[in-house]
Structures are given as C-alpha cells and as structure tokens.
Amino acid sequence: MNTHKTIIFGAGPLGLSVMDALVERGYTGITLINRPGKAPETLPREVNILAGDATNPEQVAALVTGADVVFHCAQPHYYEWPEKFPPITKGILEGVIKAGVPKLIFGDNLYMYGPTEGKPVHENLPYAAEGRKGRTRAEMAKALLDAHRAGKVKVAIGRASDFYGPRVQGSAIGDRVFPAILEGKAASTMGNVDLPHTYTYVKDFGRALVTLSENEAAFGKAWHVPNAETLTTREFLNLAYEIAGQKPKISSVGELMLQIGGLFIPEAKEMVEIWYEFNEPYVVDHSPYAKAFGAHPTPHREAIRETLEWYRNLN
C-alpha cells in the first residue's frame, strides 16, 4: 500500500488512466479534481473527487497542499487550446509551486515538433510547429521545464502520439472508428491509411506518467511514452475489424473535405493544422524511455480488444 497523497487534475480519459495505474500499484490517497467535481463513472474506493478551477493558482494551492505529486491531465476543448490551455497550465504550475508540492507530471502530446518529413519523432527535435496548437504546446512545455530548471518544482513530461482506448472518444482513432467497426460499417479516418502511424494506448500513457513520477531520473525532461509496434493505419483498422468479427471497410477523408468540414465543425477545422501526421510516415521513437525505465506497451491486439469491449458496453 502506498499512502502518498496524489492529485490528478482532469477526469478525462488520461486522468482516469493515471488513476487506474495508481490503484494498480497500491496507491490509496488519490484525488481527482475537475471543474464540476463530478466523475463520469463510478470511482474506486481509493479515489475521491473535488471541484476546482485549475486557472486559479490560489485555489489550486489550497487543493494540493500536502500532496506528494500532482498530475496535470486537464485540458479544454480541442478548438479552445490556444485561448484556454495556457491559463490552466499556468494556474496548476503556480498553485503547485505556492503549495510546495515537490513533483509535477504533465501529460503532453507531440504537436510542438511540427512536420518531420516522415523521419522518426524523437525528443531532441526542435519545437518547429507553426500551427497555433503546436505553438501552444511548445510554450507550455517550456514554461514547465523552466520552472524545473529554476528549482521551483520537479517537472517531468510524458508525451504520447494520437491515443485510443477505453473512455477515448474525441480522437483520430476514437468514436468515428470503433462504433462503426462493431456495427460492420466503414470506419472514418484521415489521410493516407497506408502510411505507418504510431498510436498510443491510453492505459500505457497513464502507466508511463506514474512511472515518471516514481523515478528521480525522469525529472527535468520530456519523454515519449512507450507504444506498441507501429502499423499502418490500414493494418491497425484491419486488426480491429478482425477482432470484432467484421469485414474491413475504411473511409478516409482528404484534406479538402477536412477543410470544408471545418467550415461547420470546430474540431474538423483544428485538424487541418496537423494534416501532416496523416500525409507522411508518423513513427514515434520511445527508446530513451525504454532504456531508462523499461517498456512493456500493451500489444495492439489486446488493447484493441479492450477498447472494443468498452465501446460495446458504452450504451
């Protein structure tokens, strides 16, 4: 049993996956914090949930006082990132520092790097994103690591690719894919489905963030979390159809259609910025993490089976 006081900001798919990983490892004093103070599902007995405004450093400090580690897994709607994400991160960072919490772990993605012309995505790439969401991610990562270097709080960042899994709906491999597969209909994706594309299983993401929190060597850096083997998107979807016992049917949206959809759907408009992910090989390298902490990502077959089961029981 681990009685450390642990705080998780955000009760979405990632925050809940961190919660699951903590419970698996015997942690007990776990608190989720989101704005309404309500959970989307029944929580384990080791976990409680509180309401809180992550943009308010004073409120954050009051909520996290006495914590051993804080996980930042909160985020606004996809189309609100540039306006609303930095204030959330700033509020959590300043509140954690004010309260004297020793460790802060941030669940991040890969947008800050921008296009890589098909070359592997690794941690030493420059922050070259030109789109607004990529720039937002870069600015937040810099602020967090600057705080670490200044000795204000120990910070570690875990970065994932496009993720999928139980509870994940608004994703490139989410609710436009798995419900259709279960019904034998065409899964809707984007770009060239015959290019390799690394996908992260959200449970592996949560476990990796907990591992970072437990290792002093993790702090002061950004790490790419472990992923199962990189497949083409077609191979990934064909595997999902096979597991579901259905015949593969894939519908891929092109860039022009995505732009047209963006005139009416805010999320589609924002996806145009990261079109490069689906129009060139997108292979993520997690070898530094594997060398430092070991890597045992869930095989896609097992992860997809668990994901399909979650969607099957959703309604």
List where the protein language model places each region.
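Conserved beta-loop-beta element that borders a ligand/cofactor-binding pocket
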Residues: 108, 142-167
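Mid/C-terminal beta-alpha module of Rossmann-like enzyme folds, strongest
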Residues: 5, 211-271, 286, 291, ...
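Glycine-rich "substrate-gating" loop/helix at the edge of Rossmann-like oxidoreductase active sites
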Residues: 132-133, 161-171, 191-203, 227-229
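NAD(P)H-binding glycine-rich loop region in Rossmannoid oxidoreductase-like domains
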Residues: 6, 36-98
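Conserved catalytic-site region of short-chain dehydrogenase/reductase
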Residues: 79, 110-120, 163-169
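Hydrophobic/small residue at the entry helix of a nucleotide-binding pocket
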Residues: 14
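Conserved Rossmann-fold NAD(P)-dependent oxidoreductase catalytic core, especially the SDR/UDP-sugar
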Residues: 90-139
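A conserved pocket-lining segment of Rossmann-fold NAD(P)-dependent short-chain dehydrogenase/reductase
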Residues: 179-200, 211-212, 216-217
